[in-house]
Amino acid sequence: MGIQGLLPQLKSIMAPIGVEALKGQTVAVDTYSWLHKGALSCGDRLCKGLPTTRHIEYCMHRVNMLRHHGVKPILVFDGGHLPMKGDQETKRERSRKENLERAKEHESAGNSRAAFECYQKAVDITPRIAFELIQVLKQEKVDYIVAPYEADAQMTFLSVNKLVDAVITEDSDLIPFGCSRIIFKMDKFGQGVEFHITRLQRCRELDLNGFTMQMLLEMCILSGCDYLPSLPGMGVKRAHALIQKLKGHEKVIKHLRYSAVSVPPQYEENFRKAIWAFQFQRVYDPVTEDIVHLSGIPHGSSEDLDFLGPWLPQTVAKGIAQGNIDPITKEPFEGKTESSALAFDKVHLNRESSAPSNGKKKLDLPVQRNVLTNYFCLASLEAKRKFRAPKVTPKQQVLNGSLPSPRIEDSGTPDLIEDTSLPSNNIQVYQCSSEHFSSGTPLDDSINTASQCSSERVRCDIPRDDSASVSPQCSHDIGSDPAEDPDIEGNKVKVNFCNRSTIPTGSFLEGTLPGISDPFLDSHNTEPSRAAPRYAEKSNVVSANRNITVRSSYFKTVNKRVCTNQGEDECHDEDNCETGNYTLPGDQQRSSGGILKRRKFSDPQNFEDGMFQPTSPHESPPVADKGCDSDSHDGINTNSEGKFGCNVAHVNKYSGIAEKSMDKFAALISSFRYAGSRASGLRAPLKDVKNTLPVRSVLRPPEQRFGCTAKKTTRVPLQSRFSSDATNSTDVPDLSTFAYRPTTASAHSDQGKITSKATDAAAGPPDLRTFAYAPTRSTTSRFDQSENTRKAMCTADSPPDISTFEYKPMKSAVRRSDGSKFSGAALKAARRTSRS
């Protein structure tokens, strides 16, 4: 656990360091901190007792990293339990049990992630786990030592006695122990931070000037450590302030008791024992091979020192230090464990062979036993059937005198095939890999061919005569040799098509290869072979110098494929691979002039002579669907003067069908001619009764018809501005009657005139100026007031004057005898306002 909150307070004096800086030095390593980190990846297996080596591999990776950079590591293991940490060990054991129970509950509930996290907290690194790592260290010749009790005290002993140059750990307890050089937080790349005890005076977070090692130790114990828990509310900063002020733990404890802080009765005694545990703990001395104290015990102390660790015999202490005796049970370990052996095989640098952790042997299969090779190398039953050489007539020998020998072409680089003697009575069609084979062979009764390639092009050009003798030229792909089958079926040719791809004809019809002898030429043909002409385009024509055009037959039942025969026999649906059987009848009639008629699927006896006559689009006969959509065109013939690719007469039939379809579509669309109807034509448009125009006008109506013009009213001569000008309107209410006007004195003689004028204004439209607030004037006004009134009334047709809405002070209705001069001044000011 260490000192809680101490390392963050010393951050300013921590310096980054790399493993390269430790080259040639010896470092002590807190191995249990590495084991705890490595156990995070296999906590569930360690808790269940299942064999695993991940934690060992974690430690050995870092050991090899140190050795790779020239650093000599000494791994230090924890030993037995220290009596001073009894309470702390009890708490940790209780926490591990609780986490183990939670992990089992989560695992039974199916929450594997939460269970794994609880397993990580429940892992207990036991001496048995450490023993497995020790066995690997022995085989790797890495130095190690098992402390009799605490590894922190053992590493401090090695550091103080200059047996090591630095200590690698994650525990801050080494600072109060007095270790001079510590490396914290070292990762797998060898990067960490370095603490040096000489930098304590430069700490910025805590003022440690004047602090001795005893004061630093007491400050750490007061803030809380593994040997003594801290008091409530006591942390590193408060402990630092108290120690800095009072200089000793006795005065601090006395000060806390007088400060109403709850201090347990045994706290001071336990504090003293904690100091002794940090200073005088029992450790193993590798020089004397015996147990010694971390530092010399002062003379005169006669108390029991078993709280520093019980005394052990030298043989037991040595056996524990060497890893042969369990430091807790004090019994020897059993023999070499399986996990340590497996771990050694994994981390050994010069191992010849490594065994996997699960113990399974590596599956080593020959090439032919793999699934991939089985898929490509096994031949089907059709490919294993042998072929019988057909009989050849002299007429066919003349026709096939120019057939070429087979040739191999692979990506533009010809490779010669080994010399193979093919029998004259058997022809084997090979399985395809990446080579192409072309052979000319006459047929009498039947040919049984099979192709197992994933992409092939089967092309057969067969001239026929009255005797039903056939001489095909087929280009196939070559693979492995299939076995022969004695069973032969007559009068049928079976071909398997799988994603066929077109192969240029000209590239395979030139030259001969000495490696393969043509069975037909060897046994029957006496004329020398002549090279066939090279074709620039893909075609089903075998020879251009003869007036014979032969197309290969088609499947009888072909589903889900659309095939065309204009220049090449390719299927548009190349994604589907189907196999079909078709029959070449032995008796096929041949018309005069070298015209070969194509057989129809639905009726093999239905043939037409002559060229296909184009018909009108509307008289196209219905197309019968017998399994192939576009292959079975009735009556499509070829003559000796042209090629089959030039015959496009069947286009007229489909153009007629398309024209009929377009006529129907146009007739359907023509019914929706009304503007406003939907473009989709889902429903008829709604009839507009009011609008009878065929085309709706898009012009905007004249805005003059809707223009707003001002209505002129009859002027009333010389009306007061307190009344409205309109007198002719009787329908529109006069809003001016609702205007607020202050009442004037009843003594004025002109009050009746004002009232009568306001009444006459009810007949006209409302004047906004009547809503202006204006004070009433006395009856004894000057003569020039009428001029202002006349000017104001002349502007009735113009927009209202905003100045009329100004606030004007009212004049008193009853004139005072001494206020004449003030009345005159007020009238002049009112006159100026009205003029403006």
Swiss-Prot record:
Which InterPro entries does this entry report, sorted A to Z?
5-3_exonuclease_C_sf (IPR036279), EXO1_H3TH (IPR037315), HhH2 (IPR008918), PIN-like_dom_sf (IPR029060), PIN-like_EXO1 (IPR044752), XPG-I_dom (IPR006086), XPG/Rad2 (IPR006084), XPG_CS (IPR019974)
What would be one Pfam family of this protein?
A: XPG_I
Cofactor entry: Mg(2+)
Cofactor binding note from Swiss-Prot or TrEMBL = Binds 2 magnesium ions per subunit. They probably participate in the reaction catalyzed by the enzyme. May bind an additional third magnesium ion after substrate binding.
Q: Where is this region: I-domain?
A: 138-230
Q: Which source organism? A: Oryza sativa subsp. japonica (Rice)
Record-listed Mg(2+) 2 binding positions = 171, 173, 226
Polar residues bias spans: 578-592, 744-758
A single GO cellular-component term from the record reads: nucleus
List compositional bias (Acidic residues) regions by residue number.
Answer: 568-577
- Give the main EC class: hydrolase
The entry's keywords: DNA damage, DNA excision, DNA repair, DNA-binding, Endonuclease, Excision nuclease, Exonuclease, Hydrolase, Magnesium, Metal-binding, Nuclease, Nucleus
Say which domain of life the source belongs to.
Eukaryota
Gene Ontology molecular function: any one? DNA binding
| Keyword Chloroplast annotated | no
| Basic and acidic residues bias locations | 84-108
Does this entry carry the keyword Magnesium?
yes
State the function annotated in the UniProt record. Putative 5'->3' double-stranded DNA exonuclease which may also contain a cryptic 3'->5' double-stranded DNA exonuclease activity. May be involved in DNA mismatch repair (MMR).
Name used for this protein in its record: Exonuclease 1
Q: What biological-process terms (Gene Ontology) are attached?
A: DNA repair
Q: Lineage of the native species?
A: Eukaryota, Viridiplantae, Streptophyta, Embryophyta, Tracheophyta
Against SUPFAM superfamilies, the record matches this protein to: 5' to 3' exonuclease, C-terminal subdomain, PIN domain-like
